[in-house]
A protein has these predicted regions:
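Rhodanese-like catalytic fold shared by cysteine-dependent sulfurtransferases
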Residues: 1-25, 33-69, 78-117
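Short, surface-exposed ligand- or partner-binding patches at beta-edge/loop junctions that are enriched
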Residues: 73
C-alpha cells in the first residue's frame, strides 16, 4: 500500500538517522530565507522555500532521488506536513517523513544552540 501522508519522525529519531551512515535521508527545508537566517540547521539540507515553488517545481524530480528517504522540515511541522503530503500525491514513489514539531522541536529536544523563534 502506498503512503498517503508523511510518516512522523521525532527530532531524536532524526538525530539518530543523521548519525547512522546506512540511513542518510535527504532533508528538505521548506522554510523561507528569513527563517533560515534566524535558525539554520547544522547539516546539509535542500532548501525549497514554499513561496518560491515556481522556481524549483520543474526540477524537483531531479533534486529528490526515489531510493533515499526524504525528511521534510519547517518551523513547527505544519508546512512540512502539507508539502510532504503534496509530494506523495505526485505518485513518484518517494518515502516521505515529516519532522514532528519542526526545527522548534529540534531546538528543544536535540540542539538547544539552534535559536527558537
Amino acid at each position: 500500500m502506498s503512503q498517503s501522508t508523511p510518516t512522523s519522525i521525532s527530532a531524536k529519531e532524526l538525530h539518530s538517522w543523521l548519525n547512522n551512515q546506512s540511513k542518510q535521508p535527504i532533508c528538505v527545508d521548506v522554510r523561507e530565507e528569513q527563517e533560515l537566517a534566524l535558525a539554520a540547521l547544522p547539516w546539509k539540507v535542500l532548501h525549497l522555500p514554499l513561496s518560491q515553488s515556481s522556481s524549483w517545481m520543474g526540477t524537483l524530480s531531479q533534486s529528490l532521488p526515489i531510493n533515499q528517504p526524504i525528511v521534510v522540515i519547517c518551523h513547527a511541522g505544519i508546512r512540512s506536513f502539507n508539502f510532504g503530503t503534496w509530494l506523495l500525491e505526485q505518485n513518484m514513489g518517494y518515502q516521505v517523513w515529516n519532522l514532528e514539531g519542526g526545527i522548534d522541536a529540534w531546538s528543544v529536544e536535540v540542539d538547544p544552540s539552534i535559536p527558537r523563534y
